[in-house]
Amino acid sequence: MPGNTKKSADSGLTAKDYYFDSYSHWGIHEEMLKDDVRTLSYRDAIMQNPHLFRDKIVLDVGCGTGILSMFCARAGAKHVYGVDMSEIIHKAVQIVEVNKLSDRITLIQGKMEEIQLPVEKVDIIVSEWMGYFLLYESMLDTVLVARDRYLAPDGLLFPDRAQIQLAAIEDADYKSEKIGFWDDVYGFDFSPIKKDVWKEPLVDTVDRIAVNTNSCVILDLDLKTVKKEDLAFSSPFEITATRNDFVHAFLAWFDIEFSACHKPIKFSTGPFSRYTHWKQTVFYTHKDLTVKAGEYIRGTITCKPAEGNHRELDIDISYTFNPREPNREPVSEDLSYRMC
Amino acid sequence: MPGNTKKSADSGLTAKDYYFDSYSHWGIHEEMLKDDVRTLSYRDAIMQNPHLFRDKIVLDVGCGTGILSMFCARAGAKHVYGVDMSEIIHKAVQIVEVNKLSDRITLIQGKMEEIQLPVEKVDIIVSEWMGYFLLYESMLDTVLVARDRYLAPDGLLFPDRAQIQLAAIEDADYKSEKIGFWDDVYGFDFSPIKKDVWKEPLVDTVDRIAVNTNSCVILDLDLKTVKKEDLAFSSPFEITATRNDFVHAFLAWFDIEFSACHKPIKFSTGPFSRYTHWKQTVFYTHKDLTVKAGEYIRGTITCKPAEGNHRELDIDISYTFNPREPNREPVSEDLSYRMC
């Protein structure tokens, strides 16, 4: 995996912040727009289906720069309401203006939970709400609030389905670069940091050849029916080694579907698909496993908002591995991670 | 230049933050420690000069994980005081402990301006205070406070010299990727964002072959004598084209020197030196220049903390270019940038 180390602000005597945003206010929008797996999937789902959008009332939850709202207007929507709490919406207003769509798109700054749309119901809700590991700092809660309050009984959601997949990977080199590094830092023992680094899932790109098991769906969301409480979940999993190899980590990614389209449109953020800015999420195990093709790793993954901070995710993975031959020890671990 | 787009948090309906730190609290420390141009320069400046550190009292301003304090202890310092306002200092305490240096290193959480050291004076101040473009969110103000309050008259500063250099670059492809992109975003005009993007210096790596002028020192700081007010500066510059080429941007970087060392140690964050996490800083011009080898670009660069937010930097660049032949138009611009 590329060693594009991640950054944080917890450094320095004064606020010597290395937030990327501290030197690029537009970078995230540039990155999301240039993520064409993401943006073209939305564009095609919307603009290839004018028969679904023509003369419809659309709500764009978390409209950002307004790109999805403009796709909907181009697809023939009667009117689009874009809602975003961020200051970006002031730019979105200017963008909609220069693109001469102000008469068909109304942008509202505020929290979905607090604002009042000028309409009772909408026919379609579009939203790009997904976060890392699908649920980390995602806007799904907000989309569900919008759905329950505004979506007409026969209304449509774009997208309307999301799945999280789990597999395992061989990752010796990068694991030692990310975890082992702290054992000897220029001759000093940094193990007090190592144990915290271990608890933190790593968001990064993984080469498909690192995956050495099949994958298992650990969450399958139908956005039309899912409830907020379903987003805290516990799922058993069983994955099977596809070759003789070592396992150093579990790997998670998500897939998205727009099933309301004439021809269903899907995209994956997994290692077998093109790069997206969501990358994948790596959970390093403490023990390394020596697996043979056909052997199982069985376990349970639990994910819930952290106590006291609902923007953080607590993810626990308990697994057991029983090798076929007695010359390899059975392995089982109960691992706890936090995305924060 | 690699298109590693920068990220910000100004996105989404709920706090869908893409701060890198939102998924790596240790990444910045990992990145800084793994920046071996940085870390090995400090290590060598300190540990190759035990004759300067033996039995001395040292203050480490912004000690972070404590690595510099530990270098000083290893170099024979009698006692090291490490000060940092961030929570990281709790980890530093544990790290110093496991490395059995607690008797020689005292770590204090707080603002340099507010805390009281248990000593009247220190013999040496070490600090890694540099930010992007040297001064952006840097800790230099704080180092100067520490110097004026605690450094003995004949005391030493590590480092004790910093320079900012300015040159020009050819950067057509990346300029169109970063600036031109906003002209046509999936068929929409995003020019309202383009004009803001232009005002923001880009922190990124630049290939040495892109540099097509000589460089000019625009700031030269002697840390023993510099005053806080000197950090708001205005400097004339004159740079000379080294080949027939096009100029798309000005480029700034900084160089650091530890001149107190037996053998002075220097490192550069410029395009002609190895990668550092500070990269370089790019200021895109609005007009592109057609220059011939030997022709001058003359101007003035002004840098000061932004009104109302001293963590932001206002940087103005005014320049004039007079080509030798009349068939090329003279060009002059007054450009304003903000690092925020």
Curated annotation (Swiss-Prot), chains A, B:
Modified sites of kind Phosphotyrosine: Y19
UniProtKB keywords: Methyltransferase, Nucleus, Phosphoprotein, S-adenosyl-L-methionine, Transferase
TM regions (residue ranges): none
Record domain SAM-dependent MTase PRMT-type: where: 16-311
EC number: 2.1.1.319
Keyword Phosphoprotein found: yes
Keyword Cell membrane: no
Binding site for S-adenosyl-L-methionine: H29, R38, G62, D84, E113
GO biological process, one term: chromatin remodeling
Chemical reaction(s) catalysed: L-arginyl-[protein] + S-adenosyl-L-methionine = N(omega)-methyl-L-arginyl-[protein] + S-adenosyl-L-homocysteine + H(+); L-arginyl-[protein] + 2 S-adenosyl-L-methionine = N(omega),N(omega)-dimethyl-L-arginyl-[protein] + 2 S-adenosyl-L-homocysteine + 2 H(+)
Modified sites of kind Phosphoserine: S176
Subunit structure: Interacts with pab2.
Protein name: Protein arginine N-methyltransferase 1
Lineage, broadest ranks: Eukaryota, Fungi, Dikarya, Ascomycota, Taphrinomycotina
Gene: rmt1
